[in-house]
């Protein structure tokens, strides 16, 4: 059962980073990822106008169960509880009068400002049940840099594409039960699209592929991942929008430890859906509140998340 306990450590250490990188648990090391799940669901294909804009994300994730590769409660683990909260700031600069291949040019940087994780669970051992718990919190656990993104604007379809780079900005301590850093970097090709099929209706999608580098502290390399954030919105009034949002997530290659695939591959999977409401008194300013519930989960915790997002020009 010790291996199960260690797997739970892996399922938690990077949870918070999943939320608050412009990003919560999955297969991979730490059960997390360096790219947000379920964050980019509103107007993501629409590159801001020339100049500086910023987005702030505040979120909470909570779960009371962790599942195995068959989607069943993990054997030997009981009374599981995880609560994670974090905040991210993302700056976007669109270069005035600059074009490449017909698209506008954006440079993007992001920084997780704060993360707080509380974890507890019981492990069944031959000698009886053992309670484990841990917490971690601190500032600036991870960062994002995208030197060149391209954005194209049409009458009803807006698209953005490019490569983002995610990296830890806090040390990873393999001796700790919980870390706020994943301990590894990721290279992430990404494509964002927003379509307005009719006035007052928005369809948004964000497709990303993550190639994860090795965590030098543990010699563990998380498998490659693909995720799709989605949103379908309806304008109740000029400044108010409601709709459904969520994500589809699948890890597509096995995790590796010391260069060899871990038993079973530890591939994560999850789907989420939930409602959102958005207030946007102008085209450049908006506040979005959304909730998502996870299902069809494998090799990760299953829970709920809440996001509060702000977008405005500087």
Ranges and model annotations:
Residues 26-30, 43-51, 95-105, 152-159, ...:
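Short loop/turn motifs that connect adjacent beta-strands in outer-membrane beta-barrel proteins
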Residues 44, 56, 89-93, 145-150, ...:
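Residues on the lipid-exposed face of transmembrane beta-strands in outer-membrane beta-barrel proteins
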Residues 41-42, 73-79, 128-135, 173-179, ...:
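Extracellular loop and loop/strand-boundary signature of outer-membrane beta-barrel proteins
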Residues 35, 54-62, 107-113, 161-167, ...:
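Transmembrane beta-barrel strands of outer-membrane/channel proteins
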Residues 81-89, 103, 137-144, 181-187, ...:
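Residues that define the transmembrane beta-barrel architecture of outer-membrane proteins
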Residues 63-65, 114-120, 153, 166-177, ...:
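Sequence/structural signature of outer-membrane beta-barrel proteins
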Residues 31, 73-74, 216-314:
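Outer membrane beta-barrel transmembrane domains
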Residues 28-33, 61-86, 122-136, 177:
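Surface-exposed strand-loop-strand hairpins of Gram-negative outer-membrane beta-barrel proteins
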